[in-house]
Amino acid sequence: MKKTLIIAEAGVNHNGDLNLAKKLIEIAADSGADFVKFQSFKAKNCISTKAKKAPYQLKTTANDESQLQMVQKLELDLKAHKELILHAKKCNIAFLSTPFDLESVDLLNELGLKIFKIPSGEITNLPYLKKIAKLNKKIILSTGMANLGEIEEALNVLCKNGAKRQNITLLHCTTEYPAPFNEVNLKAMQSLKDAFKLDVGYSDHTRGIHISLAAVALGACVIEKHFTLDKNMSGPDHKASLEPQELKMLCTQIRQIQKAMGDGIKKASKSEQKNINIVRKSLVAKKDIKKGEIFSEGNLTTKRPANGISAMRYEEFLGKIATKNYKEDELIRE
């Protein structure tokens, strides 16, 4: 089984504060995640002045500002990107960022990013998909809100414009913050695998870590999860994010699950082998048996340990003649 890649999604939980963004990088690195991911955008390039906030954003941000005003406060400029990439390198964690507009695609490409993460909202954005495809980079494509037809169309655009199909990973996702458990539909991961024959992961917007863990057990090769310094901070995504200790627990338990998946061959494990003779049973004298007596249900039984004749041969011995004397509880040796 491939190692599951863990993307710790800082997103916009830095609240526009570069020092907080650096702290989030340190938390992600300490947790054991493989990547820390931010979001790159020029708000005016991707949000019109008429765009309304999503219902979850209305609950977690000021009601007297537009979506554009809310998002403008969360922008990271070129200098900030460079500082964060350098800080991630110092912390020994890979840097990712999701571009939300064409200008930001160029910015991330110029900064040398090797992997481009396409968010669910851009899966129907033709100019955006074509631009990323032409970079011929590895792509992680989130599929929240999309049906199989829309995903197929996006894949066709990517592959016809320069992206290599084998370099694309799909992420199943439910685009709601937090996502209701009854709408997660983890079985859709298998539907994506069957339909497109690509690696499939899961972008988790539920509360807690257990749904991500279930996704790993179902074969997710990537897990993406939002995290924050404090869920009670002001901002659109904090409430649906993990706090540092939860992120660390997620990473630890994902690694444990991966070890537990094994190779699928059913056999006694190395640690079990020493217990075979201890917990299995052998043929034992139920009471004293004299030489020449016939073994019967009345004088023959099965008990631990298993270093005698296997209890599976019980019926084979019924009716046989004992060739020696046995004391009660003595292992049968014939």
From Swiss-Prot:
**Single GO MF annotation:** N-acylneuraminate-9-phosphate synthase activity
Coiled-coil region: none
Q: Which reaction does it catalyse?
A: 2,4-diacetamido-2,4,6-trideoxy-alpha-D-mannopyranose + phosphoenolpyruvate + H2O = N,N-diacetyllegionaminate + phosphate
Which InterPro entries does the record cross-reference, listed alphabetically? AFP_Neu5c_C, AFP_Neu5c_C_sf, Aldolase_TIM, N-AcNeuraminate_synthase, Neu5Ac_N, Nonulosonic_Acid_Synth, SAF
Q: Which residue range or ranges hold the AFP-like domain?
A: 282-334
Q: List the CDD domains.
A: SAF_NeuB_like
The protein's Enzyme Commission number: 2.5.1.101
Instruction: Name one process (GO BP) from the record.
Output: glycosylation
Pfam families assigned: NeuB, SAF
Q: Which UniProt keywords apply?
A: Bacterial flagellum biogenesis, Lyase, Transferase
Q: What class of enzyme is it?
A: transferase
Which function does this protein serve?
Answer: Involved in biosynthesis of legionaminic acid (5,7-diamino-3,5,7,9-tetradeoxy-D-glycero-D-galacto-non-2-ulosonic acid)(Leg), a sialic acid-like derivative that is incorporated into flagellin via O-linkage to Ser/Thr. Catalyzes the condensation of 2,4-diacetamido-2,4,6-trideoxymannose with phosphoenolpyruvate (PEP) to give N,N'-diacetyllegionaminic acid.
Question: Could you identify this protein by its name?
Answer: N,N'-diacetyllegionaminic acid synthase
User: Which species is this record about?
Assistant: Campylobacter jejuni subsp. jejuni serotype O:2 (strain ATCC 700819 / NCTC 11168)
* High-level lineage: Bacteria, Pseudomonadati, Campylobacterota, Epsilonproteobacteria, Campylobacterales
Tell me the gene name: legI
